[in-house]
């Protein structure tokens, strides 16, 4: 079944079309949610909310641009809304609790870190830093757009991005030392 047929079926509230949309895109969209969530259950909650929005707003998809891109945008906006609703309940753990070595100021080898390492380190950022970092680096938004989406000043977006990068660099250096690789 084509995307257009699935869209038309979902607009008519056809359960089979809704299931096909879920089956075809839930894995991809869960990956998007994982970048903004602190753990998998939270990402799954975001995904559920995103699909509710998708189903309720599917009639607004104009057909211009990629359908997958529209789904991604709805999902990212859902993650932002989820972040705002749950901001006071967020906590993060810190790799510094597990690392006693002093940090050098060198870079790192990308191939040295597993996807799990990178995911864990990203999730150790505060929710605000992680949100700005992901919107800027992964989604490609400009700081002005991020500021408008999150209701913050442009300079706040820039400084949070800069601080997130510095924190990530330090945490990755610490992780390398923990693994016994001195750069």
Regions flagged by a language model, labelled:
Residues 9, 90-91, 148-149, 165-183:
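C-terminal edge and immediately downstream basic/flexible tail or linker adjoining helix-turn-helix-like DNA-binding
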Residues 90-91, 98-123:
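Acidic, proline/glycine-rich intrinsically disordered inter-domain spacer in sigma factors
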Residues 59-62, 73-93, 111:
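Arg/Lys-rich amphipathic alpha helix in sigma70-family domain 2
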Residues 31, 45-52, 65-77:
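Structural recognition of an alpha-helix C-terminal capping motif at a helix-to-coil junction
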Residues 25, 160-163, 167:
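Residues within the DNA-recognition helix of helix-turn-helix
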Residues 11-20, 30-49, 154, 177-178, ...:
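Short, charged helix-capping/linker segments at alpha-helix termini
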Residues 132-136:
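A short pre-motif secondary-structure segment
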Residues 11-12, 49-66, 85-87:
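Sigma70-family region 2
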């Amino acid at each position: 079944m084509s995307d257009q047929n699935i869209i038309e079926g979902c607009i008519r509230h056809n359960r089979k079309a809704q299931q096909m949309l879920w089956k075809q895109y839930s894995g991809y969209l869960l990956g998007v949610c994982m970048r903004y969530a602190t753990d998998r259950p939270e990402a799954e909650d975001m995904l559920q909310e995103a699909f509710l929005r998708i189903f309720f707003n599917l009639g607004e998809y104009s057909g211009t641009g990629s359908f997958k891109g529209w789904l991604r945008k709805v999902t990212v906006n859902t993650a932002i809304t989820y972040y705002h609703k749950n901001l006071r309940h967020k906590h993060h753990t810190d790799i510094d609790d597990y690392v006693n070595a002093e940090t050098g100021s060198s870079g790192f080898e990308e191939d040295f870190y597993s996807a799990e390492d990178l995911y864990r380190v990203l999730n150790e950022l505060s929710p605000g830093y992680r949100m700005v970092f992901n919107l800027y680096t992964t989604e490609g938004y400009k700081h002005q757009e991020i500021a408008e989406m999150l209701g913050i000043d442009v300079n706040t977006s820039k400084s949070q991005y800069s601080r997130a990068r510095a924190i990530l660099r330090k945490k990755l250096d610490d992780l390398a030392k923990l693994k016994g690789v001195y750069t």
